[in-house]
Amino acid sequence: MDNKFLTRWVFSTNHKDIGTLYLVFGIGSGMIGTALSMLIRLELSAPGTMLGDDHLYNVIVTAHAFIMIFFLVMPVMIGGFGNWLVPLYIGAPDMAFPRLNNISFWLLPPALILLLGSAFVEQGVGTGWTVYPPLSAIQAHSGGAVDMAIFSLHLAGASSILGAMNFITTIFNMRAPGMTMDRLPLFVWSILITAFLLLLSLPVLAGAITMLLTDRNFNTTFFDPAGGGDPILFQHLFWFFGHPEVYILILPGFGMVSQIIPTFSAKNQIFGYLGMVYAMLSIGILGFIVWAHHMFTVGMDVDTRAYFTAATMIIAVPTGIKVFSWLATIYGGAVRLDTPMLWAIGFVFLFTIGGLTGVILANSSLDIVLHDTYYVVAHFHYVLSMGAIFAIFAGFYFWFGKITGYCYNELYGKIHFWIMFIGVNLTFFPQHFLGLAGFPRRYSDFVDGFAGWNLVSSLGSTISIVGVIWFVFIVYDAYVREIKFIGWVENTGASWSSLEWVQPSPPMSHTYNELPFVYGSYSALRPRNS
């Protein structure tokens, strides 16, 4: 390994190279997470045990959740697309703190190794991603596995907090002259709001898991009633992080879809730009005051439950504004159904279904029945597996040419979309029926009455796996054929609505050696010299 390679990839201070590292790391982690999900669906494809005991099943479920959240969606959306695009969008030469950016990435591989390693220590972490005590306490999980998982979360959390500080500073301080906040592309807004959510929510998680660590190892009793503690306190702390976290996972997806839809509808800008910004801000703020809707079954006062029900439903309003603005952008446009647009439309449609089941679950009385059933699993997988992941694929196909300089095969991309669309819907739609029938989460075995829909669900996941393998082939194919990427903008008739298309594809290692000057409304940003 020569020195030049080390300098470029290990000691990198270039936002593009670090963004590429994040993307590659995220895709690699996603493969592991997908393999784990396939193991889950194999175990559940028929009654009876396949993998072994319940505990092993729960270890797989826990690892699947942590990997998909902390090592796929966040690194790809915020670290990958965020690093690559935010400086390009705002006309900045790089991120504000390039070396901080480097360590933000390099904290993640050790975190992943710790998480995977925890499965090989004693019996592994069979707590679910929520890590509730007393199951995660030393009595139920003796040995070092949970401690390793906690340390893994500390590293991943530190990485995200440092990255968030970097993005906030960059977006506030490094915008090109004329790039005022009301001209900021929606993707940049989404990353900014996400960064604030990370900065405010992750320290609470860090506090909670540190208290759990001391409970396990130093005889404190934060979460042990025998010593005057309360396990419900952990749930409050965890979900105060956990609920903003789900918006952290989806907001950059909103931003990406908001960049893609106007381009393929031949529109200069999104419908209702300012409304979109305020909607994202509202979602970010409301996300912090609804956390206890995850805890309707722990025995809260009826008036507390009423408040959290109402507050949760209010989030549907800004979300609805976003959905209808996307639809209004498409309406009347010369829509071109290229691959990124297919993913974006799929995102809007399926995310809306996930949102509707979310409104149902917001009712505390209904949630008491549906809590910890597969209805909840179906709900958040519609939002994540078909919201976040579809947005990631939309962004990947949209910016693939910009990042690599190569064209992927358009037909192959569309085939990928349809395989995944059929696969994920076949996987998760039947889970609504299972949940309504009372099939509980986190069980590896079940009575025969649930066998039918579980088999359908497992067939769907097999189709999704084929889609993932096909995706790897598409990337390989693009690199082998080396067809030069020209650009979407020339093809779709939209004007340059953002700065990144002014750059060549792939962009030079250092962009904006001279600061661009941005003028005109949001709808027609151009550097002065074009």
Curated annotation (Swiss-Prot):
Biological-process GO terms, alphabetical: electron transport coupled proton transport; mitochondrial electron transport, cytochrome c to oxygen
Gene3D superfamilies referenced in this protein's UniProt entry, alphabetically: Cytochrome c oxidase-like, subunit I domain
Binding site for Fe(II)-heme a: H64, H381
Details of cofactor binding: Binds 2 heme A groups non-covalently per subunit. Binds a copper B center.
The EC number(s) this enzyme carries: 7.1.1.9
Subunit structure: Component of the cytochrome c oxidase (complex IV, CIV), a multisubunit enzyme composed of a catalytic core of 3 subunits and several supernumerary subunits. The complex exists as a monomer or a dimer and forms supercomplexes (SCs) in the inner mitochondrial membrane with ubiquinol-cytochrome c oxidoreductase (cytochrome b-c1 complex, complex III, CIII).
Identification of the protein by name: Cytochrome c oxidase subunit 1
Native organism: Metridium senile (Brown sea anemone)
